[in-house]
């Protein structure tokens, strides 16, 4: 995968984290916890795709060209699911942020502190496992790929936290839509190239 494609995949994966961080900042999530959250999201976006990449590489060795087709379909499917979720959230007026805010300490949630941060970081990193699997099936530069994904996810999370108070919910749903479109486009491009 060329560098631009890798960056686009990483940005697409970071849109969930950006949206969540924007909403968390609107809900009063600030200070040390906010920066710990950004770093944790970055780490999750390194280790989740890493696990997926190794599973994908194993599948690639076993199945050859079929694995590349499966990888492309996984990316396109993840993008389609992101689009579907964004569409449903827009129709119902809800968002992932609203569901997750209840776990923040002081907001009546069950989880607190580090557990809440781990839960939220994991929830926005699950897509990275599947995307890592898809990328592993086409043999990519593993260290470069996971470090790029982690850095971009942490950066997008930090930007979401910084911009949250000013931007409101304007970018939240739109970012998820853009991320879904990017993943679908890259998956289709990979599929055509197989």
Curated annotation (Swiss-Prot):
Key words, A-Z: Cell membrane, Ion transport, Manganese, Membrane, Transmembrane, Transmembrane helix, Transport
Entry's family note: Belongs to the MntP (TC 9.B.29) family.
Compartment(s) where it occurs, according to its Swiss-Prot or TrEMBL record: Cell membrane
Record protein name field: Putative manganese efflux pump MntP
Function: Probably functions as a manganese efflux pump.
Classification via InterPro entries: Mntp/YtaF (IPR003810), Put_MntP (IPR022929)
Species: Moorella thermoacetica (strain ATCC 39073 / JCM 9320)
Cell cycle found in the keyword field: no
Keyword GTP-binding assigned: no
Annotated Pfam families: Mntp
Membrane topology type: Multi-pass membrane protein
GO cellular component: plasma membrane
Membrane-spanning ranges: 6-26, 35-55, 66-86, 109-129, 142-162, 174-194
Molecular function in Gene Ontology: manganese ion transmembrane transporter activity
